[in-house]
Amino acid sequence: MEQTEEHTDTHTDEQDEAVDRNDRKERIGVVESAKMDKTITVSVRRQMKHPMYGKYLERSSTFMAHDEGDEANEGDTVRIMETRPISKNKRWRLVEIIERAK
């Protein structure tokens, strides 16, 4: 008789969760407002090409992000990452401050 070895998957749910967590969306933008407690408003700018005329236009989106330590100030360039819903409007959190406002 021949014995067969079963291949067991060494991947755990925790490892899958860690991979998913590292695969979240990230954006770089400028802090527009830091007046709220533990919350910043970040403006993310992007360029898009007009579908008919081909001109490049600048568009912006604003995101409310969680800033646990109230570290960011207006004008700072920051990196934000998508996260679970923290409140009605907050689905992003501050990862790092890239450049301080001058």
Swiss-Prot record:
Lineage, highest ranks first: Bacteria, Pseudomonadati, Rhodothermota, Rhodothermia, Rhodothermales
Kinase listed as a keyword: no
Cellular component GO terms held in the UniProt record: cytosolic small ribosomal subunit
Membrane spanning stretches: none
Function field: One of the primary rRNA binding proteins, it binds specifically to the 5'-end of 16S ribosomal RNA.
GO BP: translation
Domain of life: Bacteria
GO molecular function: rRNA binding; structural constituent of ribosome
Subunit structure: Part of the 30S ribosomal subunit.
Alphabetic keyword roster: Ribonucleoprotein, Ribosomal protein, RNA-binding, rRNA-binding
Family under the similarity heading: Belongs to the universal ribosomal protein uS17 family.
Pfam families for the chain: Ribosomal_S17
Keyword RNA-binding recorded: yes
Disordered, as annotated region: 1-27
PROSITE patterns for the chain: RIBOSOMAL_S17
The protein, known as: Small ribosomal subunit protein uS17
Coiled coil ranges: none
